[in-house]
Amino acid sequence: MQKLKNSPFFTSKRTHFVFMILFPIFICGMTELGQMQSVSELLNFTFTRFGIMVFSTLLITAIFWFVNFLVKRAWIGGLITATLFYAFSCIEYYKYFISGAHFLFSDLAMTKNVADLTQFARLHFNPLLLLSLFLIAAYIVCLWLCDVRIERKFPVRGAISFIIGFVTTISLTVPALFAPVCTVFGIDNTYSYNAFSDEKRFENNNLITNFAVSINQQVTSKVEEPQNYSEELVNSMLDDADVEPVSESSIVKPNIVFIMSESFGDFRQLEGMDVPEGTYDKLDEIKKEAFSGQAIVPTFGGNTVRTEFELMFGLPVKSLNNATIPHSLLPANVEQDTFAQMYKRQGYHTTYLHPFSSSFYGREEVYSEYGFDRLMFIDDLTVPVQKLRDYVDDDTVYRQAEQIMAETDGPDYIHITTMQNHQPYGSDDDTEVGVYLKGIRKSCEELQDFLNRLKESKEPTIVFSLL
């Protein structure tokens, strides 16, 4: 290799120039090809949305040179840059394949534990991603053979790197600067509210640019405090002098069980949808005995915490600039005024129950400030665990809730977020919709069993189920 490294070709400044100039273009192409899985579609997008590809290439160029000035050697800067964007390409491909949702900046805030994310994925071999990896590796080897170095002392290199990073950061995060950038390059910076609106934006931007737009959206979702806002003002608006006080001794405090059922939807409302007979029979039986209606949630295909936030605070995320992860807007180490907090003040024992990892979305850290006496995740379950596919089933969670109510003195408030019917829905012997609807049927059956057991309990209990 040393002989090859010293050859006229790899020692030529012209060769160095060509490899350095083409690197961002090459990485841009490999990144988009990996997630698009079609050379013809990539070429068509390049010709029809040329400005987008130019912006993506310039962004890669900025990151490439930002790293280069820090590490001095171009092949190391190239390796770091290529690894970053190849990882983005793989994440986008597999995430969209499994969930139908695109990779966004907010996804990076979902978990501090990468192992949590792998539980959602059923990875399969992809020849084009493997080919891209080999081509990228070959290019990095060529950069190593060129051995391009920035011959400047670190203070100078560090200063230049800082300038590149600073200019790039403010260009992406400051709305007044990002808006004209979008105009120049034809970027679709439409605000995305869910997977459907993001799909339309992604078609116009592709992976790299859409990810950059999601960075700007994350920053601009910051909420500003209204003028003259104060706790006293809110309390004065809520006070009702005409309401007669109720004697505490006359109040019956039933257990409150709040169930947020994973990925539940009534597919009978979709035109042309062939739903197997009996799928929702148990749900219909439950509705005959209960008050029921339709619920509208602020998310689809991901970001469960958006719905959780609305149900815990009674506050629509739309009022918070549709923040992707609304609890990220809250100040740290401050007790939050949630429904759990309200019930706790009324003498309830409060529990949050979610049979998944405590680190996902940072729930354990954040929800400890929501007024819950106890947080229970998958490692905290004390009843025998059963699973549907890869996740703890609803029956296990309901029996855990029953155990909590039996062991505590006084009334309980339990917020349950289930996991049973979470994606992926892939199966060798059924369609994704078929697998999903089988999970729905099981969810309905196990909810009815839970309600029937509660009817036999001596403790009065109200169940609110978001289905």
Task: Give short role names for the model-derived ranges.
Residues 2-201:
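Transmembrane and membrane-interface helices of multi-pass
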Residues 99, 105-106, 195-208, 298-302, ...:
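Membrane-interface micro-motifs in multi-pass membrane enzymes
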Residues 175-258:
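Membrane-interface segments at or immediately adjacent to transmembrane helices
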Residues 81, 104-108, 205-210, 395, ...:
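Short, well-ordered coil↔helix boundary/capping segments
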Residues 241-254, 260-261, 266-467:
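Solvent-exposed soluble domains appended to multi-pass membrane proteins
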Residues 119-122, 128-129, 240, 246, ...:
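Membrane-proximal soluble helical/coiled-coil segments
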Residues 108-111, 204-208, 231, 280, ...:
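Alpha-helix initiation and N-capping motif
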Residues 99, 106-116, 128-130, 210-218, ...:
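Short alpha-helical interface patches
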